[in-house]
Amino acid sequence: MTYVLFTLSVMLVMGFVGFSSKPSPIYGGLALVVSGVVGCMIILNYGGAYLGLVMFLIYLGGMMVVFGYTAAMAIEEYPETWGSGFEVLACFLVGLMMEVGLVLWVLDFDEVVVMVGFNDMGNWVVFEGEGSGLVRSDSIGAGALYDYGRWLVVVAGWTLFVGVYVVIEITRGN
């Protein structure tokens, strides 16, 4: 299981480095979608079935629609891949070397500090009629988002509305 997680982590880093090395929008979108799929697999590996499914359906579904539309609008006759030019290949290799250097630098410190700790199981216990039971943390996360993070949902909805309004105003024309 450790090898699977290590392989998925390497694929995730390579996907994001491949996206950030600025190839053609078609290949950049492909790298981002592949990185999203690998991220879903990492979440599933940690036991987050609900969160992995939500991320796969909503996040990747939306990304495929957006990247399909933008790739159709920015189509090139000869799209630039990661190996077609020296600059893009150099950016990709430098990004990978920096990522490996960062991992080696972090591994040099012998400890990892946990910033958030859940020491109380009271948040995850459900009290029913005569007994009590536990709820999985990923399925209660959606309820916690709308309960404790309702301001975040409002801000995210308002941001999406303003973004759509700005795009409509820009593309409307006179």
Curated annotation (Swiss-Prot):
Q: Does the keyword Metal-binding apply?
A: no
| The keyword NAD belongs to this UniProt entry's keyword annotation | yes
Q: Example GO molecular function term?
A: NADH dehydrogenase (ubiquinone) activity
- State which Enzyme Commission number(s) the record gives: 7.1.1.2
GO biological process terms, alphabetically, are: mitochondrial electron transport, NADH to ubiquinone; mitochondrial respiratory chain complex I assembly
Q: Which reaction does it catalyse?
A: a ubiquinone + NADH + 5 H(+)(in) = a ubiquinol + NAD(+) + 4 H(+)(out)
Name it. NADH-ubiquinone oxidoreductase chain 6
Q: Which organism is it from?
A: Papio hamadryas
Q: Which gene encodes it?
A: MT-ND6
